[in-house]
Amino acid sequence: MKIIVTGGAGFVGSHVVELLIKNKHYPIIVDNLHSGKYKHVKKFVDSGKAQFFKIDIRNKKNLMKLPKTPAVIHLAAIASVLESIDNPSYVNDVNVAGTLNMLEFCRMKKIKKFIFTSSAAIFGMYDKKSSEITKTIPNTVYASSKLTGEQYCKIYSDLFGMNIVCLRPFNIYGPRQNDSYAGVISKFMDRLSSNYPPIIHGDGKQTRDFIHVDDIAKAFLL
């Protein structure tokens, strides 16, 4: 089955693409290569197992050049919290307007299945176990952009009968992680591999949830 994967050349997206191929699907990769890397998917494209379009999801006209597929997996986003602080308008354009463009693309192409990549960041500084009904309190522009994306997804589901799932992954780690956005596990491993002790801030008692990129990739195929 052909499946559009936005952000498919990125850290998580390239793993989703790889898993789709292993499950006999044909990914249509959409990426503007702002943070994604073509080398992550080149072997799949060269071997004819995937197709690549260098398209920015903010460009509605170019999006309409994409083929109709049974489903869309939407990962394309600015994932840096720091960038959302420094350049909130840009992050809003990509994460909010870009998501709206993808939903509208699906409506126009009559694509009913849509998976949106949200974030556990929408819960804010929540210090207890969270679930689907936990109150959302976003405290960054990035988190707010993801929650807004979820709200647009609900509207399109209600109005147009789209079958939409929103995933809320927490801190993802694993191969191909962008050095600029590397999480604490990557930074710990980099220092340990160079025979330096990891840098631990505070008293070391803070906790954080992590998930390996292979596990989150599987979640998109459930």
Model-inferred region functions:
Residues 128, 151-208, 213-222:
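NAD(P)-dependent short-chain dehydrogenase/reductase
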Residues 1-172:
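N-terminal Rossmann-like NAD(P)+-binding domain of SDR-like oxidoreductases, especially those catalyzing
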